[in-house]
Amino acid sequence: EICACLVGSEMCIRDRLTMTLADFPELAFFKGHTLITTDGTTLLGADDKAGVAEIMTAAEYLMKHPEVKHGRIRIGFTPDEEIGKGVDFFDVKHFGATFAYTVDGGFEGELEYENFNAASARIEVQGRNIHPGYAKDKMINALQVVNELNNLLPPCQRPEHTEGYEGFYHLISIRGEVENASSEYIIRDHSRVKFEEKKRYLQAATALLTGKYGEGVIKLTLKDQYYNMREMVEPYPEVIDKAFQAMEKAGVTPIVRPIRGGTDGARLSYMGLPCPNLFTGGMNFHGKYEYCSLNTMQKAMQTILNLIELWGK
């Protein structure tokens, strides 16, 4: 759905949803832009179709303009990034690049080379179902145990209460009944120290409930997913410097901020391919309020071309 620019203090999406400046203050920046929106019933998919479009448009430009001098260029697309499996089978050596950039950011000018350290946690509870009329001192309600564990985690460390460099525990799923129940979390923090502390805290909470209900009732499975790329990118300041130059040449003001999430670039950086992240112009990812600025997409494409020229020199 292509809509005209924001008018006044709100924008309607197919008469189904309304975005207001009060709820989405960053909309003010996009006054005068042409915005691509959802139809109001599902997500847009700008994360990361916007990046794909920008990369391919830049490639098309280079094919049509052989006078643009550049070095060897490698382009890659990874599936399953959103579930943390995007580079499971990515062959960095075969790819043959020294440095790379993901085009997977959002707001115009975003330049990101810090991301969360990330882990997943699964809690499985084996309850004991007894007729509720005769359950005193016998029943173990697995659903209640799952809820009890969640209540042991700091409420202030939930996504809806955190920003900037603040990490969180995010409860993403609860399933079950009295006899069996499970819950799933993602754990995030930019600081490796605080990240490890969060995992230990969850282990301690699980141990506390094991002491209360007995062995075999509750099981915790923790799995690290990816780590903050900063320590792998900072030794190569030229990668960041050239991104600054490319943006400024495109008329974009660089905004360095931590990613409150992750990219495949984080894992690629640990695989020996330093890979910071560039903006796309997409906003409000993963939901019905998602939109993308066509104007910013054009600047993202120009930033890519500028990077190619700068590295070519």
Model segments located where?
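Short, conserved micro-motifs enriched in small and acidic residues
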Residues: 42-53, 136-144, 291-298
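Solvent-exposed residues in well-ordered beta-strands and their adjoining turns
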Residues: 78, 104, 124-128, 188-190, ...
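Phosphate/diphosphate-binding glycine-rich loops and adjacent basic-rich segments that engage nucleotide
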Residues: 100-135, 139-145
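Metal-dependent amide/peptide-bond hydrolase catalytic core
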Residues: 143-313
